[in-house]
Amino acid sequence: MSEVLPYGDEKLSPYGDGGDVGQIFSCRLQDTNNFFGAGQSKRPPKLGQIGRSKRVVIEDDRIDDVLKTMTDKAPPGV
């Protein structure tokens, strides 16, 4: 998991004129490779691969009945 750490003591700068005001400091993320998740590390598809889909297996016992009733009925307005 990423840790948020300050840049260093030389990067710290006081904020405001009063001594009772806190300090604002910059911070950075360590190990940002996994920050956006695994999906970001994929390469974009090649031009010939755009629009091609993988085969999908439908595991529904009723799909044959549903598809049959859809083809038997005429769409409304036709």
Swiss-Prot record:
Keywords: Cell projection, Protein kinase inhibitor, Synapse. Pfam families: CaM-KIIN (PF15170). Residues 41-68 are annotated as: CAMK2 inhibitory domain. One of its GO terms (biological process) is long-term memory. Brain specific. Highly expressed in frontal cortex, hippocampus, olfactory bulb, caudate-putamen and cerebellum (at protein level). Changing residue 58 to S: Slightly phosphorylated. InterPro entries: Camk2n (IPR026779). It is found in: Synapse; Cell projection, Dendrite; Postsynaptic density. GO terms for cellular component: dendrite; neuronal cell body; postsynaptic density; synapse. Disruption phenotype: Knockout in a spontaneously hypertensive rat model results in decreased blood pressure and vascular reactivity to N-omega-Nitro-L-arginine methyl ester hydrochloride. Increased renal and serum endothelial nitric oxide synthase and serum nitrate levels. Reduced fasting plasma glucose concentrations and a 23% decrease in visceral and brown adipose tissue relative mass, resulting from a decrease in adipocyte number. GO terms for molecular function: calcium-dependent protein kinase inhibitor activity; protein kinase binding; protein kinase inhibitor activity. Its main location: other. Interacts with CAMK2B; the presence of Ca(2+)/calmodulin increases the interaction but is not essential. Interacts with CAMK2A; this interaction requires CAMK2A activation by Ca(2+). Belongs to the CAMK2N family. Potent and specific inhibitor of CaM-kinase II (CAMK2). Plays a role in the maintenance of long-term retrieval-induced memory in response to contextual fear. Modulates blood pressure and vascular reactivity via regulation of CAMK2 activity in addition to regulation of left ventricular mass. Mediates the NLRP3 inflammasome in cardiomyocytes via acting as an inhibitor of the MAPK14/p38 and MAPK8/JNK pathways, thereby regulating ventricular remodeling and cardiac rhythm post-myocardial infarction. This is Calcium/calmodulin-dependent protein kinase II inhibitor 1. It comes from Rattus norvegicus (Rat). The gene is Camk2n1.
